[in-house]
UniProtKB/Swiss-Prot annotation:
Binding residues annotated for Mg(2+), in chain numbering: D16, E18, D212
Listed name of the protein: Enolase-phosphatase E1
Originating gene: ENOPH1
GO MF annotations in UniProt: acireductone synthase activity; magnesium ion binding
Cofactor(s) the record lists: Mg(2+)
Length: 261
């Protein structure tokens, strides 16, 4: 087993979710298809609720910002032609959601609606979040060693809490000290990691970021964050240069904390 020694100055471990703590297959084969298959029914059931209308307003604002993109799908204004017909408006929102998801967009508006849909599904017991078997034991060990553990994902903070609160391992939210999403910045921008360090109240070199995405790893590294790239089944392959440049682990159990001995 490869062992990666965690630098002594590290006091915070920052975790990505998809492809790092959780199989990509769970996200791609269960979470995302659930949204596509149920978004119209969800909107019809919750259309009159303020939370749903807030989601729609955010999606409409995003659609306006996207109007210059090829193939962009508009969401009409709340007043005007067809606005009095909820089904017509719902279809416009559904079409926009499908379009964004087909491009694997990570917009805050899309993530917020997805998070609300997943909340309903998790609370109804329709699904449980999957974690790799090495994750929970390792995180418990890190916390016992005095480490802080945070999560940074493109999924909304609410969606993150749903995953950790409704997992196949039970409710493991207590293992996480805090959550960050794209509201603090995108994961491929180095400034986001500086903001996270400021929010936590530490230096960037006190953080070890675990992710499966090399572009995120590069951005974090540029900010002065320590990085390890997690190689899991189903993850995108790495180039030879990336394999040489980054520290690689295939399991959280491969991290060695000098402070835990």
């Amino acid at each position: 087993m490869v062992v990666l020694s965690v630098p002594a100055e590290v006091t915070v471990i920052l975790l990505d979710i998809e492809g790092t703590t959780t199989p990509i297959a769970f996200v791609k084969d269960i979470l995302f298809p659930y949204v596509k298959e149920n978004v119209e029914e969800y909107l019809q059931a919750h259309w009159e609720e303020e939370e749903c209308q807030q989601d729609v307003r955010l999606l409409r604002k995003q659609a306006e910002e996207d109007s210059h993109l090829d193939g962009a799908v508009p969401i009409p204004a709340a007043s005007g032609n067809g606005a009095d017909d909820p089904q017509w408006m719902i279809q416009a929102v559904v079409d926009n959601v499908y379009w964004q998801m087909s491009l694997d967009r990570k917009t805050t508006a899309l993530k917020q609606l997805q998070g609300h849909m997943w909340r309903a599904a998790f609370k109804a017991g329709h699904m449980k979040a999957e974690f790799f078997e090495d994750v929970v034991p390792a995180v418990r060990k890190w916390r016992e060693a005095g480490m802080k553990v945070y999560v940074y994902s493109s999924g909304s903070v609410e969606a993150q809490k749903l995953l950790f609160g409704h997992s196949t391992e039970g409710d493991i939210l207590e293992l996480v000290d805090g959550h960050f999403d794209t509201k603090i910045g995108h994961k491929v921008e180095s400034e986001s990691y500086q903001k996270i360090a400021s929010s936590i109240g530490c230096s960037t070199n006190n953080i070890l970021f675990l992710t499966d995405v090399s572009r995120e790893a590069s951005a974090a590294e540029e900010a002065g964050v320590h990085v390890a790239v997690v190689v899991r089944p189903g993850n995108a392959g790495l180039t030879d240069d990336e394999k040489t440049h980054f520290s690689l682990i295939t399991s959280f159990s491969e991290l060695y904390l000098p402070s835990s001995t």
